[in-house]
Amino acid sequence: PVLAFKPTDRTDLVIDLQLKGGCSAIFHAYDEPDVERLMQSPFGMIGSDGSLTKPGDGAPHPRAFGTYPRVLGRYVRERHVLTLEDAVRKMTSFPAQRFGLWQRGLLRPGAWADIVVFDLGRLHDRATNLAPHFYPFENYPHRYPEGIDYVFVNGVRVIEPEGHTGALPGFV
C-alpha cells in the first residue's frame, strides 16, 4: 500500500506504482489570490489539462467538464475578477490566435463555428472528486455543468437541452 512507504522511498514508490499499472495525482500549486492574479494578466489564457474520457469509460478529471463553467460562474459572475468579454476572449480567440488556429476562436465568415450557448445566471460547474482520498480522479457518473443549453462544433449542433444529438462533426 502507498501508506507503507517511508518519505525516503519516494523514488521506489513512483517506480512501484508505475510497474503496477501507473497512477495519477492532483497537485495544488496555487492559492486563490494567485489564480485571480494570473487570470487578470493581459498575457494569460484560460485552458485545462483535465483528461477526457467517453461517458462510461473510466473516470475523467473534474477539470475536463468544469474548468470553463468555473471561470465564468465563479470568477466572472460571482467575484468579478474578469469581465465576461475578457474571460471569453481568454478561452477562445486569444489561444486560437496564439497557437495559429486561424479558423477557430472567432465568429466570422469562413471560420469554423464552434459555439457554446450558455446562461451566465445558471452556469455552474458540478464536476467533483467523489472520493478524493481513495481515488482522486473519480468523477463517475460524469457530471456536466448546469447552464449550458447548446454546443455547436463546426456549425453543427451537438448538445441541446435533452443531451447529445449524436452528431460527431469534429475531427483531429
Regions found by a protein language model. Give the residues of each.
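C-terminal cap of metal-dependent C-N hydrolases
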Residues: 37-43, 48-51, 117-169
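His/Asp/Glu-enriched, well-ordered alpha-helical/loop segment
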Residues: 1-20, 33-124
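The substrate-binding groove and active-site-proximal loops of carbohydrate-active enzymes
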Residues: 25
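Cofactor-binding beta-sheet edge motifs in enzyme active sites
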Residues: 67-69, 168-171
